[in-house]
Amino acid sequence: MGRKSMDIFSSERSLIGRLFQKSILGLFLAFLALVSPFMGAAKADRIKDLGYFQGMRTNQLTGYGIVTGLAGTGDSSLQYTIAAMTALSARFGLSMPSNVSPTLQDAAAVIITADLPPFAKPGQTIDITVSALGRARSIRGGALMITPLYGADGQIYAMAQGNLEVGGLGISGRDGSNLTVNIPTAGRIPSGATVERAVDPGFASAPYLQFNLSEADLTNVQRVATAINNALGPGRAHVLDGVSVAITAPEGAEIRTALMGEIENLPVDRADARARVTINARTGTIVINGAVRISPAAITHGRLTVRVDENYGVSQPNAFGQGQTAVTPNSTITAEQTRSPMFHLQNGANLTDIVKAVNAIGATPGDLAAILEGLKQAGAMNADLIIL
């Protein structure tokens, strides 16, 4: 009876898993089939959609601080937390004997990170992310003490402080049981830092303006230079390499800012992207762009299913014997391989053909990834295969 129930449960679970995988893959393939007719077509974009001007960049800030007000979920013995709280107490005139090492269960050492956007001015606020550094179980409900945020040059660019917003939850019982939802040791503080120092973008006094593509492309960089010359006059823009375009402009922040605003809104025809297939092995996500083409190839893909059934029996000795009652496990391992029909891809098969062929054999995302890897190894797919 136990074996039959377990077989039924295993069959239902495997059936649900197959239906879930097929439904997810079906949605993915339907999406690809819907957008594939439009992916290869050239579209007029703005220059600002292809890259950015030199100096208009985000800078990362980092700081180390203390979160207080935790309900016994903080760091109990981390020396950094103790030293920081001792220094904070001394700042407010509270001295602590040197031989005293307090236990701070309501405080936690944290790392604060933030992105300083371009042209941020003193007095503006930015969002920050707070993450536990030590043994804190949760920082939910805590408040970050005032903390300086440093740039890569070691200068202070912002000051952070505020109450945390934590989406995770962690609860522990006295018997050792615990319940954790999401990540309770990381949170955010919207507008939690005030900018104290501005970053000079440096474009006002540079010998020329420089526009950089977000991704190197020889065709796109030439088209950007051509669009700028057509709008501003011949010889104003010169290609430096596969990423950068140099633009001559009069000196001065006001005139260059106006010129940059005009340039970034110029239309340009984006070149077709390189054929690329991206596979995220952890999530099963597969992205195929419309430039992928397939050479003649025949494909078949089998599926191997391994099943382990666990049953337990009881070994009961005689009443007058010296043996002991014991539980004896009984494992049954079976392997089943299913065969899929072979399908043939014609020369120059595009994304739609791949979607139809893979959908016809009912492949899962894992099967599709294996098929694409096989096509690449066989030299039948002219695309960059990127596995994350």
Swiss-Prot record:
Entry's localization field: Periplasm; Bacterial flagellum basal body
Cellular component terms per the entry's GO annotation: bacterial-type flagellum basal body, distal rod, P ring; outer membrane-bounded periplasmic space
Annotated GO MF terms: structural molecule activity
Signal peptide per UniProt: 1-44
Swiss-Prot/TrEMBL keywords: Bacterial flagellum, Periplasm, Signal
A Pfam cross-reference name: FlgI
GO biological process: bacterial-type flagellum-dependent cell motility
Function: Assembles around the rod to form the L-ring and probably protects the motor/basal body from shearing forces during rotation.
Assigned protein family: Belongs to the FlgI family.
Subunit and interaction comment: The basal body constitutes a major portion of the flagellar organelle and consists of four rings (L,P,S, and M) mounted on a central rod.
Protein name, as recorded: Flagellar P-ring protein
Organism (species): Zymomonas mobilis subsp. mobilis (strain ATCC 31821 / ZM4 / CP4)
